[in-house]
């Protein structure tokens, strides 16, 4: 599994402004930015990311994921 495939899947399934993925073997860190996360709890945000990737997780192509998710407003505040 490569990070380009993960980016492609998430961009196709979620309305994201930006997405960044880093990879270390089968461990991935995902930072996703989009208003799809606005008003959602952290658990619901993680589910939004996990759901499109569930087949890759169950097939052990992805072993572990660390997720950071931001609405556009949160991302803008975080960058200052």
From Swiss-Prot:
Belongs to the BolA/IbaG family. It comes from Buchnera aphidicola subsp. Schizaphis graminum (strain Sg). Gene3D superfamilies: BolA-like. It comes from the Bacteria. PANTHER family: ACID STRESS PROTEIN IBAG, BOLA TRANSCRIPTION REGULATOR. InterPro entries: BolA, BolA-like_sf, BolA/IbaG_stress_morph_reg. Pfam families: BolA. This is Uncharacterized protein BUsg_372.
């Amino acid at each position: 599994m490569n990070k380009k495939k993960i980016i492609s899947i998430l961009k196709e399934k979620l309305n994201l402004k930006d997405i960044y993925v880093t990879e270390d073997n089968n461990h991935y860190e995902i930072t996703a930015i989009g208003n799809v996360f606005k008003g959602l709890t952290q658990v619901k945000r993680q589910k939004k990311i996990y759901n499109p990737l569930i087949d890759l997780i169950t097939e052990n192509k992805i072993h572990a994921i660390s997720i950071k998710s931001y609405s556009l407003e949160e991302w803008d505040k975080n960058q200052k």
